[in-house]
Amino acid sequence: MAKTTTLKEFESVFPKLEEALLEYAKAYKLPEQMLSWYKQSLEVNTLGGKCNRGMSVPDSASILLGRPLTEEEYFQAATLGWMTELLQAFFLVSDDIMDSSITRRGKPCWYRQEGVGMVAINDAFMLESAIYTLLKKYFRSHPRYVDFLELFHEVTFQTEMGQLCDLLTAPEDKVDLDNFSMDKYTFIVIYKTAYYSFYLPVALAMYMLDIATPENLKQAEDILIPLGEYFQVQDDYLDNFGLPEHIGKIGTDIQDNKCSWLVNKALSIVTPEQRKTLEENYGRKDKAKEAVIKQLYDDLKLEDHYKQYEEERVGEIRKMIDAIDESKGLKKQVFEAFLGKIYKRSK
């Protein structure tokens, strides 16, 4: 029987990896002051999240093997998981600067912490480099070492393309709803979120166990990308319709001029009069204008449209999971576990 990891177990691996990263920097005689800065950046930016992406690597590996992982297997899988968390940290530190964000995980964003400022850009680069330091240290002799390397490089580029499309489609200071479209939205969510959050952890587990045949990778991608897309649509829905006490934050997509699923759905069904209301009120840092949009979303019955989308999408995903060929080591349960975590979530 497979075994699910806990956050506590997963986090217990981090100190060893942090030590390896600091030792690597020490070997270059990085001065003490800079070493402690690097340590602080690693801890503040990598720890403190839910670690869903990282924990998906050992979880998927255990399902694929059909048993709990040995200590050595767990360490390997969790190390790959922490590399996905480092990738996430690199993206978040950078994104927060680009978006002029204020808080992250309930604290001021890294670049807004005392004495950090634009040094955060270099810190983000160092978080990305840490992935490859760990990969070399622990997987240099793994038969799929080059595949691991290429996977991280490819997924990083895919995420950056998604971010570029997002930044140019919805600049915060210039509202132009003609720029929005469901096609652009789909591109953004697939590349900015789905690849690194859903495909990457499972592909890493498959490479680790050496069952990443082209057929298995294709089957995984064909299910995990729609799953990631559904997850992001859900996120956009919760930003407006979720309860702040559930989602742990107050939604800001409307004021931030976000190219979200809700605004794109609205644009596809509005009357000319409602379109004018959208144009005049969307993407403004103004509570009253935000309230006008929220009312419009209610008038358009976007909650019902979302629920219809959810049932259709989940139905399609379930069909794909049922059709998986398990003869080459892939397991339906990997995907059922992902779907189970996100279907009808409220946060």
Curated annotation (Swiss-Prot):
Q: Which PROSITE patterns match?
A: POLYPRENYL_SYNTHASE_1, POLYPRENYL_SYNTHASE_2
Q: Which transformation does this protein catalyse, written as a reaction?
A: isopentenyl diphosphate + dimethylallyl diphosphate = (2E)-geranyl diphosphate + diphosphate; isopentenyl diphosphate + (2E)-geranyl diphosphate = (2E,6E)-farnesyl diphosphate + diphosphate
Pathway assigned to this chain's UniProt record: Isoprenoid biosynthesis; farnesyl diphosphate biosynthesis; farnesyl diphosphate from geranyl diphosphate and isopentenyl diphosphate: step 1/1; Isoprenoid biosynthesis; geranyl diphosphate biosynthesis; geranyl diphosphate from dimethylallyl diphosphate and isopentenyl diphosphate: step 1/1
Q: Which UniProt keywords apply?
A: Cytoplasm, Isoprene biosynthesis, Lipid biosynthesis, Lipid metabolism, Magnesium, Metal-binding, Transferase
Q: Name one Pfam family in it.
A: polyprenyl_synt
Please provide, alphabetically and separated by semicolons, the GO molecular function terms listed in this UniProt record: (2E,6E)-farnesyl diphosphate synthase activity; dimethylallyltranstransferase activity; metal ion binding
Q: Name one GO biological process term.
A: alcohol biosynthetic process
Principal localization reads cytoplasm
- The UniProt record lists the EC number as 2.5.1.10, 2.5.1.1
- Which sites bind isopentenyl diphosphate? K50, R53, Q88, R105
Q: In which domain of life is the source organism classified?
A: Eukaryota
Q: What does this protein do?
A: Catalyzes the sequential condensation of isopentenyl pyrophosphate with the allylic pyrophosphates, dimethylallyl pyrophosphate, and then with the resultant geranylpyrophosphate to the ultimate product farnesyl pyrophosphate.
Family listed: Belongs to the FPP/GGPP synthase family.
Q: What is this protein called?
A: Farnesyl pyrophosphate synthase
Source organism of this protein record = Neurospora crassa (strain ATCC 24698 / 74-OR23-1A / CBS 708.71 / DSM 1257 / FGSC 987)
Gene encoding it? fpp
